[in-house]
Amino acid sequence: MKILIPISMSCLLFIGCKEEKKETDTKAMEAQREIETVEKEPGSSFEINPVSHASAVFNWGDHTIYLDPVGGAEAYQDYQAADLILITDIHGDHFDVATLEGLDTSNAKIIAPAAVAEKLPEAFNSQVDVLANGESKERYGITIEAIPMYNLREEAKDFHVKGRGNGYVLSYKGERVYFSGDTEDISEMRSLKNIDKAFICMNLPYTMTVEKAADAVVDFKPKQVHPYHYRGRPDVSDVSRFKELVNKGDS
């Protein structure tokens, strides 16, 4: 099966923050939409709206899903209020209480790992579904599975400890979409099955190399892959090289 990699300005590229370090102060990461909304694909109701770096808004059927909303509520003012909010980890480029408090979350369910839920204000308690790695929950007809995300390299293991954060697989009306979160090419990723769209991180030193990301994608063979969570710099994450490696491995 040939993997489609939409790497062009008309498709999804999440441009990362330009800081040299992984910034935990989200005030230094004002989210901006770097490109226009991606149109729905024929036969699919899944629409992608990049915000910045690891954050995005997805429209899927009648549902609106926010992924790791940070950068201030103003970055989301043009979108419908969320039905689902997925939070992957505790770091400031994935989780920001001030942004959440500024959003209209009155009808939203928040899906998060325990490490995130523990940091949420009590006002959100009734809205939160806590998922550990391997657990799942159905909301609005969408099944959300929590997938492990963690580092493998010895020098990077403290960045993302196994069991703390979640990647997610969402299943809805026959489609399956994977969000990797901050991870390396772990066995749990490589063993995924029947993924229609995969959103794969790749940036050093916090996640994985372009080569490892491409190799993992070739292993689990999603129908389509979108690189995200990278810094928009070829010395950190070369998306053209990623596309070349995936195409070569998938030939």
Regions found by a protein language model. Name each.
Residues 13-16:
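C-terminal motif of bacterial Sec signal peptides marking the signal peptidase cleavage site
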Residues 23-80, 130-193:
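Core dinuclear metal-dependent hydrolase active-site scaffold
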Residues 58, 89, 96, 144, ...:
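Divalent metal-coordination and catalytic microenvironments
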